[in-house]
Amino acid sequence: MKTKKLAILAAILMTLTLITACSTGGGLRGPADAAEITAFERIQRMMFELQTYRAIATVEYRSNKGSNVYETVQHARITGEYRIEVTAPEAAAGSVTTSDGRQIHQFNNRVNGRVSLIVQETPERSEIFLTSFIRNYKQSEEVSVSVADMDEGVRTVLEASIPGNHPYLSIARLWVDNETMLPVKLVIFDADGAERIVVTYHIFEYNVVLDDGLFTI
């Protein structure tokens, strides 16, 4: 398995110089020096080694009618299990969605005698997890890497296609801090390049121990 991961990583690195030229729109540019290439390699290695994460993140859904913003706590495994709890706004606070990889349940942990509902998966929910981005990145026929110069520092930007031909979820971009190696934000674009979902990470922890009970009722 490790050999396969390294082979995939090597293949992506070999094509890096070919794809950066077409991924520099929207204030992005290609890696300019050895330090930025090294940061990219470290970030890629981090992605391939990620097994679990815990995060506090703001999730914003945008449409032609406006936007809806939620504060969330996320737990996820690369194997597909996840848990997301909404902590704000107050009207949605306490809402929890869990997936054990087979079934998805929703409940509100602020309601006494809570009732759990089995629900269908939706890409609007599943694609907000970093683990989904990593899986798409590994499986994409074409991926790209760019660099963004921001007031807070230099960010490496990874891009991957989202499978399924969803009209509003076409491309995902992940901004990662070159110094901390922590994800800063994940943005999902529609086919016209409009931002549809923006996930902003406030606290992010890699490869934490997650109890199986987090993903079950």
Task: Spell out what each predicted region is.
Residues 1-9:
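Bacterial N-terminal signal peptides that target proteins for export
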Residues 2, 17-72, 76-77, 81, ...:
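N-terminal leader/targeting segments and the immediate start of mature chains
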Residues 10-18:
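Bacterial N-terminal signal peptides
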Residues 27, 31-32, 48-49, 102-166, ...:
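Flexible, processing/modification-adjacent segments and terminal tails
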Residues 49-52, 74-83, 98-103, 176-183, ...:
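Short, solvent-exposed coil/turn segments at beta-strand boundaries
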Residues 58-62, 85-89, 107-109, 161-163, ...:
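A generic structural motif
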Residues 73-128, 194-197:
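An acidic-aromatic
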Residues 148-217:
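Gly/Pro-enriched, hydrophobic low-complexity segments
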